[in-house]
Each structure stands twice: as structure tokens, then as C-alpha cells.
Amino acid sequence: DGDVDEMDFRYHGPIPFSKETAVLMMADSVEAASRSLADKTEESINKLIDNIIDAQTKDNQFVNTNLTFRDITVIKKVFKKKLQNIYHVRIAYPV
């Protein structure tokens, strides 16, 4: 049987109730998913962050918070910059 039930992999706890808990949820999801990226380019990191946070927004995960669309845009921008800094390729220096 190749069918996968999405509900088996969803968190069944309460949705975030404050801006802070929403940001923690976003950060945890983005950080965990970024570890599985084979190609950690700026484009792939940006796409990953947009997809995850957009899906959480569409899934009404932030309805109990006071987050605005502007807040979410700023959060995405910060996450993108931070992850790009973490995963940027360093030049090999002679030893």
C-alpha cells in the first residue's frame, strides 16, 4: 500500500497562541527541513522557507496570534538571511 496519511505526521497539539510561539514553530520547522536539503543554494533555501511558512499560514496555524502579513514577510526575510549565512560555502584555504 503506497498511500500515506498526512495526519500520521502532523502535530496534534495546540496551535501557537502568541507571536513568540508562532516564530518558534516556524524556526523549528524551517531548521529541521533545511537539514534535509541536498543542495543548499540561496534559491533552494528561499523556496524551502517560503513553502513551509506559506503552508503553515494556509493551514491557519497563526490565527490565534497577532502576526500580520508584514510580520510574516519580515520573519521569512530574517530566516533566509540566517540560513544562507549558516550554509554558505567557504573557500578552501591552503594549509
Locate predicted features:
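Terminal helices and disordered tails flanking the catalytic cores of nucleotide-processing hydrolases
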Residues: D1-V95
